[in-house]
From Swiss-Prot:
Known role: Binds to 23S rRNA. One of the proteins that surrounds the polypeptide exit tunnel on the outside of the ribosome.
GO molecular function: rRNA binding; structural constituent of ribosome
PANTHER family noted in UniProt: 60S RIBOSOMAL PROTEIN L23A
A GO term from the CC aspect: ribosome
Keywords assigned: Ribonucleoprotein, Ribosomal protein, RNA-binding, rRNA-binding
Name of protein: Large ribosomal subunit protein uL23
BP GO terms, sorted: translation
Family membership noted in the UniProt record: Belongs to the universal ribosomal protein uL23 family.
Length: 86
C-alpha cells in the first residue's frame, strides 16, 4: 500500500491537541484495510519519525483511527505544526 493511501487525514479536536502536547501522540484516520505495519511504514516515510507504539480502532461509524505514539527523540508538536494542525 502507498503511504498516501494508508493515511487519510489527521484528526483535529481538543482531545487530539491534548494528546499531542501531553503524550507525544498523533491521531489519524487511516484506510480500513491498512495493517499496523502499513501505518508504521507510512508514518516513517511521510514524516521521517520513528513510531514507539501504535493503537488502532474502528469507530461505530466505520472509520478506522490510529493513535501513534512517537519515540521520545521526536516531537509530535513539530510534526503537527508541519501539517498545519497545531
Amino acid at each position: 500500500m502507498d503511504a498516501f493511501d494508508v493515511i487519510k487525514m489527521p484528526i483535529i479536536s481538543e482531545k487530539t491537541m491534548k494528546l499531542i502536547e501531553e503524550e507525544n501522540k498523533l491521531v489519524f484516520y487511516i484506510d480500513k484495510k491498512a495493517t499496523k505495519t502499513d501505518v508504521k511504514n507510512a508514518v516513517k516515510e511521510l514524516f521521517d519519525v520513528e513510531v514507539k507504539d501504535l493503537n488502532t480502532l474502528i469507530t461505530p461509524k466505520g472509520k478506522k483511527k490510529a493513535y501513534i505514539k512517537l519515540k521520545d527523540e521526536y516531537d509530535a508538536g513539530e510534526v503537527a505544526a508541519n501539517l498545519g494542525i497545531y
